[in-house]
Every structure is written in structure tokens, then in C-alpha cells.
């Protein structure tokens, strides 16, 4: 959701030199779901731009025995290219507005709110594990900046985020978003809400 710059990577294990297996051939069963699903993920920065992985790492070129079978790159490469070709160009149906700065502030200044941090991350993790089609993330800070610069950016999306604290700029932006026809799901404790 927040990065010091625009770089983030997609890493995929085609071979494993440390354990006696080649994930593409053995664990993945030559099925590309672990390529297409992660490569459909995007982040939205403060300018409202869609960010995709800037680096693709493939580990490793050789298998446990030091062999470099051409079958694996021959089969994997077309899926990587297709996933990149079909990469997101707009926010997804659901956009996770991740409270990066809020969680950081709570961890430092309000240790009593640490359970909320864990709850928020675990709630979304479990939702994804249960099939919620979440592929887009932005931070609360980036959301507030992006919506100012591109008011229609999230028009086709449902935002999902924590219940904002009373009187915060996030609360005001989310209320304005909903009043202007935006769709929003909030979750978590409402102890500090309006």
C-alpha cells in the first residue's frame, strides 16, 4: 500500500535448488494459478496511478541436481507474458484502503490498539483466503490524495477499510466519497468512531 518508491517485485519459484523438487513440475502441477492470481494484484499511488510489479524474479534457473531443463521456462514464460498483458489498468471491484499510517501511529503511540492492527490484517487475510475478489490496494494517505486528483477513480469500485477515527481527514474523505455516490464497506471496532 505504501512504498518508499514505486518498486515492488513478483517472485516465482520454478525450481528449488535446496529441496528435492521443482515447484512448477511438482507442487504447482504445471497449473498457472500462482502466476495469474498474484500478477492480477495492483496498488494505487498518491497520484492515482495503477502500480504493477516492477521486478520479476524467478528462482531458480537450476533444479536440485544443477540441471536446467528447458521444459520449465518454455511452459512458464507464456503464462508470465499473458498475465502481464492482462495486468490491471484500473482499480478492481474491491479496493482495500489500507491504514498504513494509522497502524504505524497506533503501534507507537497507542499500544492498547495493537489488537485492532492484528484484527484488521487477519480479517482481510481471512476474507481473501475465503474467496473475496480483492486485488487492489491503496493506503489511506494515497487514497485521500488520489481521490482529490482523480475524483472518479473509484467510481466503479467498492472501498473496504477500517472504521475511521472520529474527526480525522480519512473520516471526512470517506463520508464525502459515499455522499457523492461511492460505495464503502467498513469493518472493525467502532470505539473511536463518530
What spans do the regions from the language model cover?
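Hydrophobic targeting/anchoring helices
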Residues: 1-115
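Helical hinge/lid and interdomain linker segments adjacent to catalytic or ligand-binding clefts
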Residues: 114-194
